Structures are given as C-alpha cells and as structure tokens.
Amino acid sequence: MSKSVFPPTAEAAAGAHVSSLDQYRELYDRSINDPEGFWAEHAQRLHWFEPWHTLREWDYHKAEIGWFLGGKLNACYNCVDRHVEDGHGDDTALIWEGNDPEESRTYTYRELQAEVQRAANALKALGIGKGDRVCIYMQMIPELSIAMLACTRIGAVHSIVFGAFSADSLVTRINDSECKAIITQDTGVRGTKLDIPMKANADLAVQSTPSVEKILVVKRTGSEVTMSEGRDVWWHEACEAADAECPAEPMDAEDPLFILYTSGSTGKPKGVLHTTGGYLTYAATTHHYICLLYTSPSPRDSS
C-alpha cells in the first residue's frame, strides 16, 4: 500500500476548518469523551423551530436511541428558506448539467424555494401528507432535488430508487415501505438515446403495488408515454396549478426523513430509515469540516 502523503494547497489549508491532524484528534476525542456537548454544539448550526429538551436517550438492550427529543425543525427550511431569509436568496443554490453539457440549469435559493413550494402544494393536492411515503424514481435531474425537498417540506418520507432499476426492483421497495405515490419521468437518457422506459416501468410496478394511488410524471425527454386518467399527473401541470406558498412543516427530531434501501446484492433489499434531527446534524457537521466550497468562510457552510 502506498504511503505517499499529498498535503493540501496553501489556499485550501488557509480556509480549512480543521487545519492540522492534532486539531482533528482533539475533535475526535471530544466526540468520544463528551458526546452530548459535542453534538449539542454542532446541532446549533441548524435552524430549530423549537429547541430540544433532552439531547439523547438510549436503551442498548432494546436497540433504541433518540436524539434531540422535543426539538422541531424542517430539512427543507434548513436547506433553502433560511438562506433566503438571511439575505442570500440570489446566491446559486443548485447547478445542473445534463448528459449534453449544453443542457444546463441553475437555480438561486429564491428560485429553488419557489419551485419547491409549488411542488409541495402539488403533492398535498394529490393527497400526500405528513408521514406518507413517496417513491422517487428519476435520473439526476433538477426535479429530483425539488421532489426530495418538497417531500421534506410537508413531512412526507421519500424513498429514492435508482433510475436504472427494473419494475421488479421498484415493486420490492415500494411494497416494503407502502408508498402512496411515485414521482418519475417519461423516459430516461443514456448517451444520445432517450429510451430508458421509466414511466413504463412504473406502470408495470403499480400492477403489483396496491398502496400506490398516484404517479407524478416529469416531462424530461418528451417521449410519448401512457397516462392513466385519475391516477397519472404531469409534474409541470400539477406545479403550475399549485399555490405559490407552502409553509414548512415543523417535524420532531425523531420523525422519519427518508428511507434508503441497500443494494439487495446479498438478499432482499433492506430499508434504512434516517430521522430528521440526527441526519441533518451529522450532514451539516460533515459539510462544515470537509466540503470547502468557498474561498472564505460563508454563512451557508452548514447547509
């Protein structure tokens, strides 16, 4: 194994939140010896509608643990709204580049907030609410991020399924989490071809998934697809018809945020449930120490 060491550039080191191995070890030691103080401090990077009354409770015999009990927050609000309210609405929030580099889209925080609120209201109009599970079966397009944020805004639990998986793979994951709706796209792109049958796969899947009531379809390629009246809805039409404002739902720290399934390569896929407060705190902490996206400290370094 190579023992080569590649030090960071002086510019990167100057902007780092951990400037030495000794500082990293100090952080690690504190996380082990004072976990409550460590994580309470890092949780303050988030916006909380209500503070927690108990940092953590656990019972290792029952394999039960809870963090930030009593605290209320919202993932979408933390990722989008607070940056708008802090005066950064015109800053870039999302950059998307398609299969063809000439195809790209950029969203500011304010633009993303507007898109997400309409999408959230579109979901609510279709009967989706807090605690309902939504399967998101799309490629890496802007609407994927918007759909995730829209679900978290209203308290729905999203479950992302890889966009190249088959109808059978969809069935397994949808039935396990009893998804109420699917968000997908007409067809998927691979190279110069537009023939990944994503909507067709969703149509096949719903024949064996009794919990699904609605399919929301993004018009990605413009390919002709079958739309079932009363069940299938075009994404753009639903969002255009939706109200412009949708307040973020305050969620308990231990409320489910999303379900991510294991690959299933060694057996039936297992759904891993991530809860709101703990996931956001860890993600914000990791981002703060690892993702140097700016050349100088930024108020958005925890999003």
Question: What does each of the following model-derived ranges do?
Answer:
Residues 1-107, 111-114, 118, 124, ...:
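N-lobe entry segment of adenylate-forming
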Residues 262, 294-301:
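Conserved small/polar residues in nucleotide/adenosyl-binding loops
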Residues 105-110, 249-250, 257-281, 303:
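Conserved AMP-binding A3 loop
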Residues 101, 184-253, 283:
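ANL superfamily adenylate-forming
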Residues 76, 94-149, 166, 170-171, ...:
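Conserved AMP-binding/adenylate-forming core of the ANL superfamily
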Residues 116-117, 272-292:
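Conserved structural elements of the adenylate-forming
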Residues 155:
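Structured binding elements
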Residues 138, 159-175, 186-195:
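ATP-dependent adenylate-forming carboxylate-activation enzymes
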